[in-house]
């Protein structure tokens, strides 16, 4: 590979002191894909495999300055957005990404941690859907997040697919609803907006694609959502279309889960470097 042409991927997310999720998981994932990782940190969290004990948001001005510094020099080919718990920070992220005409934006709507801790207030959730979702190439909610976004019960593959289609219709972006919270399955469904006619109207319902992978029986699941969304961003940065990018991201996460680390007293981390 020509080292002057290595794609960069920007992660806009919170820092995880235990290294298993957030910015740290994103950097590991991007590096494992042999791409160049850049960051804009939105919050500092004190957390480990047992849960989150403290969150300190970064000043919105500093978040904006980080994004500007990245785009002004080493422009990313894709952007992954993770934990953003402040409406004001969401507003500046949307403003800066719009100003720089950012492409290939993957939004992981981090609303609730695996441990159950809630990361986002109601006003921030509203800003997330109003400002960031319209900029996204794809959003990647898990089932609890999809239910919270839609106020809709998801308890089967049929309702999971309906949720993905509803999200795509409502927010205008592709939606990947992850099925890992089902007991016996790890199947995800992608809904993409239908093509547009000459007047800008969608020609039919969203197009859906299922991604079926075997469920890895492990308790080491810390950072799985961060890892998958970053892996999808990496694939988009390398020029894959969205469905292929999701499939590649799923395959990477499956390997990382299978090789996960038995570390800590709770939900341990996945092994981001499992291919090496």
Tell where the protein language model's regions lie, with residue ranges.
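Short, well-structured alpha-helical segments that form the helix of a local strand-helix-strand
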Residues: 160-168, 209, 241-256
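N-terminal phosphate-binding or glycine-rich loops at protein starts, especially the Walker A/P-loop
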Residues: 7-31
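Short, small-residue alpha-helix embedded
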Residues: 147-148, 219-242
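Conserved N-terminal subdomain of the carbohydrate kinase-like
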Residues: 2-11, 31-114
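Charged C-terminal helix
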Residues: 6, 54-57, 243-276
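Short pre-catalytic strand/loop immediately N-terminal to key active-site residues, enriched for Gly-Thr
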Residues: 12-18, 208-223
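Conserved phosphate/ATP/ADP-binding segment of small-molecule kinases
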Residues: 122-208
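Phosphate-handling active-site elements
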Residues: 34-38, 198-209, 235-249
């Amino acid at each position: 590979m020509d080292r002057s042409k290595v794609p960069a991927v920007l992660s806009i997310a919170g820092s995880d002191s235990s290294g298993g999720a957030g910015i740290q998981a994103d950097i590991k994932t991007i590096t494992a894909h042999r791409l160049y990782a850049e960051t804009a940190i939105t919050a500092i969290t004190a957390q480990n495999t047992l849960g989150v004990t403290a969150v300190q948001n970064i000043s919105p001005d500093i978040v904006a300055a980080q994004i500007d510094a990245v785009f002004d020099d080493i422009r990313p080919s894709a952007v992954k957005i993770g934990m953003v718990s402040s409406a004001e920070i969401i507003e500046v992220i949307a403003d800066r990404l719009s100003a720089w005409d950012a492409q290939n934006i993957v939004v992981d709507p981090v609303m609730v941690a695996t441990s159950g801790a809630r990361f986002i207030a109601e006003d921030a959730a509203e800003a997330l859907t109003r400002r960031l979702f319209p900029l996204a190439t794809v959003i990647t909610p898990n089932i609890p997040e999809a239910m919270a976004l839609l106020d809709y019960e998801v308890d089967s593959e049929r309702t999971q697919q309906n949720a993905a289609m509803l999200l795509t219709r409502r927010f205008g972006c592709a939606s990947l609803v992850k099925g890992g919270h089902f007991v016996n399955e790890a199947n995800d469904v992608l809904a993409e907006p239908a093509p547009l006619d000459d007047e800008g109207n969608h020609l039919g319902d969203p197009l859906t694609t299922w991604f079926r992978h075997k469920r890895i029986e492990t308790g080491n699941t810390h950072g799985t959502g961060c890892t998958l969304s970053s892996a999808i961003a990496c694939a988009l940065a390398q020029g894959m279309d969205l469905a292929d990018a999701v499939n590649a991201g799923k395959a990477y996460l499956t390997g990382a889960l299978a090789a996960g680390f038995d570390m800590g007293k709770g939900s341990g981390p996945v092994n981001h470097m499992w291919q090496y």
